[in-house]
Amino acid sequence: MGCLMSNGPAGCRRSQGSVLIIVLWVCIGLVSIALYFANQMTYELRAADNRTSGVMADQAIEGAARYVGLALQNYATNGATPDNTQFKCEAVAVGDAKFWLIGRNPNEGNATEPYYGLVDEGAKLNLNNVSTNVFQYLPNITSDFADAIMDWRGTNGVVSLDYTSLGYAPKYAPFETVDELRLVYGATVAMLAGEDLNRNGVLDATEKDVNSSGELDAGLFDQVTVYTREPNFHADGTTLTNVNTATEGQIKSLFQTLGTSRQQQLWTAINNRLHPPRGQGQNFNGSLDFALFCKNQGVSSDGFAAVANSVTTSTNTYFRGRVNVNTAHYDVLVAMFMGANVDEASAESAAQTLISYRQQNPSNLGSIAWIIDALGNNSSVVTALARGNYLTTRSYQFAADIAAVGPFGRGYRRVKFIFDVSDGPPKILYRQDLSRLGWALGEKARENLVAKDTQ
């Protein structure tokens, strides 16, 4: 009644309209606040989902590490290198998560998609054992940096390097990890990682082809290791037969399949080399030297393979730094050959010949004698390598570079493990989180994940 008496109907309507506008603004404000917080909760929900997926990926990696340990226990016996067809390596389901083992194909130099499997550490050069003569022939390395590596690991400084500006002193002790190379004087990303910044063995679209070669130029991280160690005894702990000190009975027992006459001929030849009637005897330098000698005495490759895992030329408990010729990369082989004073052209030709032979004759790689079959008894490369103990066909350390994702391809994680089976059961020597390097599974894996999650 007061509204009607004081202002009339028009004044009352104006008052009611003002209230309506205020109410509308209040409603708009409340709705905006509600939408804002709802949007914030959507982001929080996504973040929580990603965290959950990440936890699932972490657990998938833990499960994958156990799986790899079991695979090594079953297949990496007596120095054998497990084949990626013997166990699952790609998109292996662990609940709603999946994992991959990012490997390297030893017979393919220019992969366009990641190769899945274990990485044989025995296929690499050991930073603590290989000389400057070998290191300097690796691509993307300078002779100065090769000297710096020797200086870092040596008990006494080999060269005079000023680490003052870097804020630390040289170690003057063996390398404990490959990543320790980052601390060596003169190290650069280009030298250590090459063009493979995410270290998956593939030139990805996000990585720059610096020299426009169309191929990946890998760095030292892919070519060196610190873990290789090969037992010089049988798996049950019994000793191998040292051919440099073996008796007639031991040699004849090893080569039983040759027959009595051939056994005697071989023993006579071995004894004449070790203990000639005149002059100084010559010990066998390594397994390749002994294999070459046996081949020249008419022993077949199969005949030598039957005894290869039972003989040695050393009294050391372990061999350190020998390279597995069955899995070594082309660049590593070339560096090894040139380090043994083989000329570059011959080294490159021999390396390619060995890789081709490996691809065409995968069942003939049981002993070191296959190198002689591939290159020939009179090869200058074989002769040079026989002067030392550089090569083997056995491996006991393997890297498992495990990447995993949770449901819908979320929560990407990546961890690298180094496994050692030289003392029997597999054990983990080293663990490194590589998630910071970004996606390493290639475009095809991403497309497959997206396709499956949108079906």
List each language-model region with its residue ranges:
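Compositionally biased linear targeting/interaction segments
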Residues: 2-7, 16-455
